[in-house]
């Protein structure tokens, strides 16, 4: 474990050195993400100027859900975004072969090879929103500790879904479109799922479970709703999807044939 931690830090340092050679691109990337999320919030604020609540949720509560959703999304984007490359080009162009010739677990290598620093924009917006809305929560020590526990498990859902959909490329040569389709469901997690129809609520809860990355844990923190389902469900589903994604990765790796073979 320590060996992999050291290697991860080495990859991060090397990638940051590369990024710092193009400082303008870095600043533009972070600002772009920051402005995108800011415009979404501005639109939401405009809506709440005309209505007092949305399905019983106040603007402050929805802002907390929105901010909460950006933290695991931003962490996954920051550390594990290279899975997009697997789905889009590594298998199709035969570039995946190099990962099989090195004395490193290929999945670990792909996960830590890049460091998407523009994700800091998402983390910054998420942090600001959480910082300005936490006063609406009656915090206790157990609740605060559960909040800290939720973040890595919510991040694991993002990463697991990307591992699973990226692994499809081992059979189809590319799966970028599939990753994109599944990943876009995360937008629904930024708002209370009670505003959606029953089918969509079921879909984003148990098939593409992004609702567990924000809405369900936020329901516990904001309204003290069912800790077993909202927090326990997050932990159980994230671990289940991680195991499934690893199984799919292993099956795909066994079926892999180089694009040049």
Language-model regions, residue ranges each:
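Hydrophobic transmembrane alpha-helices and immediately adjacent juxtamembrane helices
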Residues: 1-261
């Amino acid at each position: 474990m320590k060996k992999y931690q050291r290697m991860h830090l080495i990859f991060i340092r090397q990638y940051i050195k590369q990024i710092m050679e193009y400082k303008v691109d870095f600043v533009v990337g972070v600002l772009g993400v920051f402005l995108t999320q800011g415009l979404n919030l501005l639109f939401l604020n405009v809506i709440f100027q005309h209505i007092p609540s949305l399905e019983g949720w106040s603007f402050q509560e929805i802002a907390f859900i929105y901010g909460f959703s950006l933290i695991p999304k931003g962490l996954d984007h920051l550390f594990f975004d290279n899975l997009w490359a697997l789905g889009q080009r590594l298998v199709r162009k035969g570039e995946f072969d190099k990962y099989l010739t090195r004395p490193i677990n290929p999945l670990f290598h792909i996960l830590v090879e890049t460091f998407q620093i523009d994700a800091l924009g998402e983390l910054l917006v998420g942090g600001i929103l959480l910082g300005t809305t936490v006063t609406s929560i009656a915090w206790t020590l157990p609740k605060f500790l559960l909040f800290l526990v939720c973040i890595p498990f919510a991040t694991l859902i993002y990463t697991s879904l990307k591992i699973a959909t990226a692994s499809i490329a081992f059979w189809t040569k590319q799966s970028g479109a599939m990753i994109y389709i599944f990943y876009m469901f995360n937008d629904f997690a930024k708002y209370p799922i009670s505003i959606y129809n029953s089918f969509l609520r079921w879909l984003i809860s148990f098939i593409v479970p992004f609702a567990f990355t924000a809405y369900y844990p936020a329901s516990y923190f904001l309204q003290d709703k069912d800790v077993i389902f909202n927090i326990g469900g997050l932990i159980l589903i994230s671990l289940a999807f991680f195991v499934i994604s690893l199984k799919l990765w292993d099956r795909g790796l066994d079926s892999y044939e180089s694009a040049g073979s």
